[in-house]
Amino acid sequence: MQKQIEIFTDGSCLGNPGAGGIGAVLRYKQHEKMLSKGYFKTTNNRMELRAVIEALNTLKEPCLITLYSDSQYMKNGITKWIFNWKKNNWKASSGKPVKNQDLWIALDESIQRHKINWQWVKGHAGHRENEICDELAKKGAENPTLEDMGYIEE
């Protein structure tokens, strides 16, 4: 029987681009694990994606996951847009390369062994776990220690 996990994620950026951070809360039964990391130069969308990737990569076995995020970009990308991107050799409908392709590929790889129910939550609306993730992401952004490998300045 696969473990049922709840994951809440958020990304933050001080300036866009600027220093960024990720926050995640993983819950299994009564156990909670919190993640917070900061990156020197990045974008908000990259942090939203990286928060999910980092959270999923902490899991040691395939799980049944309900994943909550306030990022429509991440949710629509992984549940709708990615299928055409992959078919079109990572080109957007405009014909231009998909932005943040490195992280979309990493996210696509990290979801393969799990069954995920994707849920959008309204940000800054009093959702307890989303508020915690927001704080964790801001903390990370305020104390960056990592390079966001793959970030390309526009």
UniProtKB/Swiss-Prot annotation:
This is Ribonuclease H. Binds 1 Mg(2+) ion per subunit. May bind a second metal ion at a regulatory site, or after substrate binding. Its main location: cytoplasm. Mg(2+) 2 binds at residues 10, 134. The keyword Metal-binding applies. It catalyses: Endonucleolytic cleavage to 5'-phosphomonoester. Its cofactor is Mg(2+). PANTHER family: RIBONUCLEASE H1. InterPro entries: RNase_H (IPR050092), RNaseH-like_sf (IPR012337), RNaseH_domain (IPR002156), RNaseH_sf (IPR036397), RNaseHI (IPR022892). GO terms for biological process: DNA replication, removal of RNA primer. Monomer. Residues 1-142 form the RNase H type-1 domain. The gene is rnhA. It comes from the Bacteria. Belongs to the RNase H family. NCBIfam families: PRK00203.1. Disulfide bonds: none annotated. Endonuclease that specifically degrades the RNA of RNA-DNA hybrids.
